Regions:
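N-terminal interaction/assembly modules
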Residues: 1-49, 78, 99-104
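Extended hydrophobic/Leu-rich segments
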Residues: 8-13, 72, 86, 90
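DNA-recognition helix of helix-turn-helix
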Residues: 76-104
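Helix-turn-helix DNA-binding module
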Residues: 64-82
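Short amphipathic alpha-helical surface patches that mediate protein-protein
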Residues: 62-63, 91
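A short pre-motif secondary-structure segment
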Residues: 57-58
Length: 104
């Protein structure tokens, strides 16, 4: 089995972020589980704490219809940033959502 640097909370947070991106209005949360609501609030809070440009970057990368690795590579030039910088933003966002959600 190959080794990976993937954090244990990454898949959970990615699921929460995708749910948030498809349910951008809190009024659409009626009937969803308490866990879905907590996930939504965690993502909303983490995004609101970021600079506007980083919020746009996260939304663009997550919303791309391709694996995150490919989206980061593609959008680095568009945002005039290095891939390393984009990964720093994405990983920081993921970690912040995990903290807000109580996963770490």
């Amino acid at each position: 089995m190959p080794m990976t640097n993937k954090k244990f909370y990454t898949d959970y947070v990615n699921h929460a972020v995708r749910f948030y991106m498809t349910t951008p209005d809190s009024l659409q949360l009626a009937g969803h589980s308490p866990a879905d609501l907590a996930n939504w609030v965690s993502v909303q809070t983490a995004l609101s704490e970021m600079p506007q440009e980083d919020q746009e970057l996260v939304r663009t990368v997550v919303g791309a219809n391709e694996p995150t690795e490919m989206a980061v590579r593609r959008f680095a030039d568009r945002y005039d940033r290095t891939m390393s910088d984009l990964w720093t933003v994405m990983n920081g966002f993921t970690k912040r959502v995990a903290v807000l959600r109580g996963l770490i």
